[in-house]
């Protein structure tokens, strides 16, 4: 990228490493032997960026004249998480310890305000699930999981464009249901996992049901809109169940015990329905 800002007779230039991102372990962030004037600025050599710099010379010829200044060049540290989202909110492990991390410059003011309002008012003005630091399950906090998923996300920050349902390649099959083998035999589409659980979005064996509902199943004309989830089969499955019966695997859904004197009231508020019944 070309920021277009001159500094000391030089022109700032930078790029994002999408092939082999250099991961930094948390314990090494402040290592004075590996950092420059800031923990986020790490030493950089010309050899490390020779290929992208050559492309920069082609697109911005003036860089050839300005040359390379090793003294002001650095490898910038970016915070990339295992699901590419920010980490905002109170730590699940340490009460009263609030974080607003993995936030980049363009999102800084908004995220800081959300965090501040959350701290002061006890709740955020919007749904914070995709930012909430408490969103991770124990298995997703393991070092190997964080490292491999973060590396995978770092390779696709800007290049190439990533489909919203693009499946992760690493840390798969952490948890599978008792029916997993049978589901695969039925042609289960396990492109994506949910909370570490392999979960089929539809089954190829049910494609035949499409013949009954061809006139009412929506058609997705764009290839981009058809990737990773066989929507037409899933729609046929739903319609078939509405007319008859079916079996649904719920083993990969979250199951929670809600206890306390206000448990019933809270659950009915959340679900907008009467759910208590005779439950003590």
Which stretches of residues belong to each language-model region?
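Central beta-strand plus flanking loop segment that forms part of the substrate or channel wall
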Residues: 1, 54, 254
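A structural signal for short hydrophobic beta-strand segments in well-ordered beta-sheet cores
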Residues: 2-4, 88
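Conserved FAD/dinucleotide-binding core of flavoprotein oxidoreductases
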Residues: 5-58, 103
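Short acidic (Asp/Glu) and glycine-rich catalytic loops that position anionic groups and cofactors
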Residues: 26-35, 93-96, 158-160, 246-248
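C-terminal catalytic lobe of FAD-dependent flavoproteins
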Residues: 39-43, 49-163, 167-171
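Glycine/proline-enriched, intrinsically flexible loops and inter-domain linkers
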Residues: 137-280
